[in-house]
Swiss-Prot record:
Any one of the GO BP annotations: tetrahydrofolate interconversion
Residues that span the membrane, as ranges: none
Family: Belongs to the SHMT family.
Pfam families: SHMT
Catalysed reactions listed for this entry: (6R)-5,10-methylene-5,6,7,8-tetrahydrofolate + glycine + H2O = (6S)-5,6,7,8-tetrahydrofolate + L-serine
Organism: Citrobacter koseri (strain ATCC BAA-895 / CDC 4225-83 / SGSC4696)
Residues that hold (6S)-5,6,7,8-tetrahydrofolate according to the record: 121, 125-127, 355-357
Name recorded for this polypeptide: Serine hydroxymethyltransferase
Alphabetical list of PANTHER family matching this protein: SERINE HYDROXYMETHYLTRANSFERASE
Main localization (coarse): cytoplasm
């Protein structure tokens, strides 16, 4: 018999210590990795529930196992909320991750060797949009598109590449692009050659849910997202579509199960359902509006302090600092800021002379600090501290001074009060 009072602390001290140390790290460090966020205790309650015990291969009402009457309710809630939130008429909530959602789209729409037009990873794209080290680059013929000299997506180049290479699918979306994407323009280009438009909105899904960023669902044939990042839910994936193409929906469902996955993670799907409900609340819209304001506030400080921001600003939750003129690498900046309890990630910048393991830039995102309650004043103060560290990257006294300020502001703005 399993006793409810069983716990990790009494049984596995080594594991518990690591878990507790991570909890402390999250509370005492400022998180600026654009893809990270803090999920709610309600989501964590769902993920720690007895739903983790249930196998449920198939879809609601069409399971391969018995005893699914209640997990059917859970999954249908998640499906219905996803459709309502994003204005879709199809949703699949089973993908274990954004990458697996993307894999399902590829396998549903394409054959190995088909040509795909995707954003260059070095200019803001994602691994699954055609990187040679990823399944997408290994299985498909990838033609990359990029950005122009102003740092914006070059739609003219995209249209020319589409006419020249006749891809079967064009991918919109990014992992390190600070602008607004013209989804309608991308659909126009796709339609001109009879291609699918597939949008990966993982980074901006929360902003889209709150009407802070344009929604691709009315324009794309298929849309995927993660459920964490700006959406602030559990780690997982989601596929959406609109337009009533039932054959397409069947292909997408089959590509997730049984093609790419077996049993869905019902405890995670419950977490998705909770997060999607939270995203419908008025305070979520206020949160996302503040995410955008905080990113802009930080950019203003970096520009005033003489730092180069790729594209000159941001229109979403993230931006890239180009450190080439500062004679700093992204790796050095990442490490120095880390010593001050400020977490970022090194990131390639356009025309980066350094390798992806070193880079010449860092990516900065505002979702997590905004979740803590930071507003423009705190965001600007933080950006100033970061400039102090980067201006004095080898001065440990400066770094220690900033670390003290970080600890103070973290105590004033706890993650979980």
């Amino acid at each position: 018999m399993l006793k409810r009072e069983m716990n990790i602390a009494d049984y596995d001290a080594e594991l518990w210590q690591a878990m507790e140390q991570e909890k402390v790290r999250q509370e005492e460090h400022i998180e600026l990795i654009a893809s990270e966020n803090y999920t709610s205790p309600r989501v964590m309650q769902a993920q720690g529930s007895q739903l983790t015990n249930k196998y449920a291969e198939g879809y609601p009402g069409k399971r391969y196992y018995g005893g699914c009457e209640y997990v059917d309710v859970v999954e249908q809630l998640a499906i219905d909320r996803a459709k309502e939130l994003f204005g879709a008429d199809y949703a699949n909530v089973q993908p274990h991750s954004g990458s697996q959602a993307n894999f399902a789209v590829y396998t549903a729409l394409l054959q190995p060797g088909d040509t795909v037009l995707g954003m260059n990873l070095a200019q803001g794209g994602h691994l699954t949009h055609g990187s040679p080290v990823n399944f997408s680059g290994k299985l498909y013929n990838i033609v990359p598109y990029g950005i122009d000299e102003s740092g914006k997506i070059d739609y003219e180049e995209m249209a020319k590449l589409a006419q020249t290479h006749k891809p079967k699918m064009i991918i919109g979306g990014f992992s390190a692009y600070s602008g607004v994407v013209d989804w309608a323009k991308m659909r126009e280009i796709a339609d001109s050659i009879g291609a699918y438009l597939f949008v990966d909105m993982a980074h901006v899904a929360g902003l889209i849910a709150a009407d802070v960023y344009p929604n691709p669902v009315p324009h794309a044939h298929v849309v995927t997202t993660t459920t964490h990042k700006t959406l602030a839910g559990p780690r997982g994936g989601l596929i959406l579509a609109k337009g009533g193409d039932e054959e397409l929906y069947k292909k997408l469902n089959s590509a997730v199960f049984p093609s790419a996955q077996g049993g869905p993670l019902m405890h995670v799907i419950a977490g998705k359902a909770v997060a999607l409900k939270e995203a419908m609340e008025p305070e979520f819209k206020v949160y996302q509006q503040q995410v955008a304001k905080n990113a802009k506030a930080m950019v203003e400080v970096f520009l005033n302090r003489g730092y180069k921001v790729v594209s000159g600003g941001t229109e979403n939750h993230l931006f890239l600092l180009d450190l080439v003129d500062k004679n700093l690498t992204g790796k050095e900046a990442d490490a120095a800021l880390g010593r001050a309890n400020i977490t970022v990630n090194k990131n390639s910048v356009p025309n980066d002379p350094k390798s992806p393991f070193v880079t010449s830039g860092i990516r900065i995102g505002s979702p997590a600090i905004t979740r803590r309650g930071f507003k423009e004043a705190e965001a600007k103060e933080l950006a100033g501290w970061m400039c102090d560290v980067l201006d004095n990257i080898n001065d440990e006294a400066v770094i220690e001074r900033i670390k003290g300020k970080v600890l103070d502001i973290c105590a004033r703005f706890p993650v979980y009060a």
